[in-house]
From Swiss-Prot:
Keywords assigned: Ribonucleoprotein, Ribosomal protein, RNA-binding, rRNA-binding
Name this protein carries in UniProt: Large ribosomal subunit protein bL20
Role noted for this protein: Binds directly to 23S ribosomal RNA and is necessary for the in vitro assembly process of the 50S ribosomal subunit. It is not involved in the protein synthesizing functions of that subunit.
Gene (UniProt): rplT
UniProt GO BP: ribosomal large subunit assembly; translation
The organism's place on the tree of life at top rank: Bacteria
Species of provenance: Hydrogenovibrio crunogenus (strain DSM 25203 / XCL-2)
GO cellular component: ribonucleoprotein complex; ribosome
A molecular function (GO) term: structural constituent of ribosome
Length: 118
């Protein structure tokens, strides 16, 4: 059986990992064994945080809606309850954007929610 020398393939594999580790600090960018571990860990963080990002944005939207609702004399939970009773189907992302960029329109939405609760 012929002998298989893996020099070219191993070098390509190493360079691929080292390229992914570009920008890392110290040995994490220079030494293959350390760089490989760093790249794997970075992938785990990226996977986890792609999911956490969705939670974080929802929390941000809710905080913004709550602040704007309180400026109009209403709490977040009563506001959302009023919207559901009024049949207003606007998601939190859009409500947050309206609250930040168009206070008058948000006040009108709050009035609809108040009317539905009364």
């Amino acid at each position: 059986m012929a002998r298989v020398k893996r020099g070219v393939i191993a070098r390509k594999r190493h360079n691929k990992v080292l390229k992914q580790a570009k920008g890392y600090y110290g040995a994490r960018k220079k030494i293959f064994r350390v760089a490989k571990q760093a790249v794997i860990k970075a992938g785990q963080y990226a996977y986890r945080d792609r999911r956490n990002k969705k939670r974080q944005f929802r929390r941000l939207w809710i905080a913004r809606i709550n602040a704007a609702a309180r400026l109009n004399g209403m709490t977040y939970s009563r506001f959302i309850s009023g919207l559901n009773k009024a049949g207003v189907e606007v998601d939190r992302k859009v409500l947050s954007d309206i609250a930040v960029h168009d206070a008058a329109a948000f006040s009108a939405i709050v009035e609809k929610a108040k009317a539905a609760l009364a």
